[in-house]
């Protein structure tokens, strides 16, 4: 009997920790940085929502879902904002949402992780890797960065496809504060 109890305890200790489900809490941000004819500008995507399943001890079981309403994209420059929402860029009348989904993360060095996912934007789906750090606590925080190849999504077509005017790569950064999922 004692052997069975010891075996049961050892078996439970050997099981991997269960991943925790998280939802986005207030204080989160999703921003981008680009440039137009050498002038740097930043923008953000208000209203995005994030769900995460994550256990730092078992990153391969991770899952990240981000829903991004494109209608509110803003750079603080009304002219840029109008153009970004139009057909040459995000074309919000045709597709008002973007979505990023990653399953199975990789542990990197220095406490970083990589989420190899797919971004669905403007009817296109392309691979995008988000590298991130994870800060434990009552409200854990994910801080991450990614690079998006805008032309692969048809962002900035026509005269805007000229990469001397707007670079092909757009830097994305995020800071997501989480709370346990209900």
Spans of features found by a protein language model:
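Positively charged n-region of N-terminal signal peptides that target proteins for export
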Residues: 1-4
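Low-complexity, acidic/polar, glycine-enriched regions of mature
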Residues: 19-182
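Hydrophobic helical h-region of N-terminal Sec-dependent signal peptides
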Residues: 6-12
């Amino acid at each position: 009997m004692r052997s069975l109890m010891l075996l049961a305890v050892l078996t439970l200790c050997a099981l991997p920790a269960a991943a925790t489900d998280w939802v986005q809490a207030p204080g989160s941000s999703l921003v981008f940085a680009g440039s137009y004819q050498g002038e740097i500008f930043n923008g953000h995507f208000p209203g995005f929502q994030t769900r995460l399943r994550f256990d730092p001890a078992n990153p391969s079981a991770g899952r990240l879902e981000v829903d991004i309403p494109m209608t509110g994209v803003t750079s603080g420059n009304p002219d840029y904002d109008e153009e970004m929402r139009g057909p040459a860029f995000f074309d919000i009348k045709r597709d008002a949402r973007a979505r990023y989904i990653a399953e199975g993360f990789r542990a990197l060095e220095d406490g970083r992780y990589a989420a190899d996912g797919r971004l669905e934007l403007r009817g296109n789906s392309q691979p995008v890797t988000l590298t991130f750090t994870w800060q434990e606590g009552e409200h854990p925080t994910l801080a991450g960065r990614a690079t998006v190849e805008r032309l692969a999504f048809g962002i900035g077509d026509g005269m805007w496809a000229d990469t001397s005017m707007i670079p092909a790569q757009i830097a994305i950064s995020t800071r997501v504060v989480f709370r346990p999922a209900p």
